[in-house]
Curated annotation (Swiss-Prot):
The keyword Hydrolase applies. Mg(2+) binds at residue 82. It comes from Polaromonas sp. (strain JS666 / ATCC BAA-500). The RuvA-RuvB-RuvC complex processes Holliday junction (HJ) DNA during genetic recombination and DNA repair, while the RuvA-RuvB complex plays an important role in the rescue of blocked DNA replication forks via replication fork reversal (RFR). RuvA specifically binds to HJ cruciform DNA, conferring on it an open structure. The RuvB hexamer acts as an ATP-dependent pump, pulling dsDNA into and through the RuvAB complex. RuvB forms 2 homohexamers on either side of HJ DNA bound by 1 or 2 RuvA tetramers; 4 subunits per hexamer contact DNA at a time. This is Holliday junction branch migration complex subunit RuvB.
């Protein structure tokens, strides 16, 4: 199988604002992501522990002809929460209905989805932490008893009726598990945290995507893309497409180590997978705030970025790689951050260097 990208023309589409962002950049990119998305566990790479658990739970549900327990997937953006929801539905052999927390503004929005589910279907709610309290209240009896209460009529004549639902599985995805209310979190029978991918795992993903995109690539070129992708498949696939463009225009079309290095340098992606925004954040903490501790609001104002974007997209990888520390008093730059920027660390005055 191969994917022809003629149908994904970038004409009249806004450019990707930040190539290393783990958030989907545009409907155009989302369309390509869907085309590259694995549909079954046999095609899925990484998250070995989560995959093993889900395969067992799905197999048991199919054996008993029951709906799978409700599933909560959480972790940084771009790690495959949406992909896993599609795989769960495909492996169960059922329909998938997809929505997001911000879209479900009123109880009737959720009720319309729930009443149209068939037996054992999967309902995927992305950004489930952003459900409004009134919608969340409707969800509780649906998750526990497969029933919802809806109001008929208005004013004094209004009355509540109970509707039975088909058994279904809710798959909720969030980058902020801590923002879920306890009652909602407790209703998920399966909770799985997605971790950043290794360079080897991303290398396998890049090779698979290159094959689907008909992009000739050698092993060294593919691994260089993978190793700079911040442990995130979405970023790996985005970098692959940009390097392929460079190879087509500046080379022979073959993605080699040399082509990958030149293309990534053009994109301002350094060997650690950091881009301009990562370096701006580290430079701000070190130069403007003496290495920290500094609060997130001050960092956001300093680099001109949204607080939520810093917390959800930029800093998780910096923390995971040991360049930034999150403390009760604020963010602190580590020795690795000073070395990466070629800045001499302070001799004294910072707790982490004592």
């Amino acid at each position: 199988m191969s994917i022809q990208t003629d149908d994904f023309s970038a004409a009249d589409l806004p450019p990707v604002k930040r190539v290393m962002s783990a958030a989907p950049a545009s409907p155009h990119e989302e369309a390509i992501e869907r085309a590259l998305r694995p549909k079954l566990f046999d095609e899925y790479v990484g998250q070995a522990k989560v995959r093993e658990q889900l395969e067992i739970f799905i197999g048991a549900a199919k054996k008993r002809s029951e709906a799978l327990d409700h599933v909560l997937l959480f972790g940084p953006p771009g790690l495959g929460k949406t992909t896993l929801s599609h795989i769960i539905a495909h492996e169960l052999g059922v329909n998938l209905r997809q929505t997001s927390g911000p879209v479900l503004e009123k109880p009737k929005d959720l009720a319309a989805l729930l009443t149209n589910l068939e037996k054992n279907d999967v309902l995927f709610i992305d950004e489930i932490h952003r459900l409004s309290p009134v919608v969340e209240e409707i969800l509780y009896p649906a998750l526990e008893d497969y029933q919802i209460d809806i109001m008929i009529g208005e004013g004094p004549a209004a009355r509540s009726i109970k509707l039975d639902l088909q058994p279904f599985t809710l798959v909720g995805a969030t980058t902020r598990a801590g923002m879920l209310t306890n009652p909602l979190r407790d209703r998920f029978g399966i909770v799985a945290r997605l971790e950043f991918y290794t360079a080897e795992e991303l290398g396998r993903i890049v090779r698979r995507s290159a094959s689907l995109l008909n992009a000739p690539m050698d092993e060294e070129g593919g691994f260089e893309i993978a190793r700079r992708s911040r442990g995130t498949p979405r970023i790996a696939n985005r970098l692959l497409r940009r390097v392929r463009d460079y190879a087509d225009v500046k080379g022979t079309g073959q993605i080699t180590l040399d082509i990958a290095n030149k293309a990534l340098a053009m994109l301002d992606v350094d060997p650690q997978g950091f881009d301009v925004m990562d370096r701006k954040l580290l430079e701000a903490v070190i130069h403007r705030f003496d290495g920290g501790p500094v609060g997130l609001d001050n960092i956001a104002a300093s680099i001109g970025e949204e607080r939520d974007t810093i917390e959800d997209v930029i800093e998780p990888y910096l923390i995971q790689q040991g360049y930034l520390q999150r403390t009760p008093r604020g963010r602190i730059a580590t020795l690795a951050a000073y070395r990466h920027l070629g800045v001499a660390p302070p001799v004294s005055g910072n707790d982490m260097f004592t």
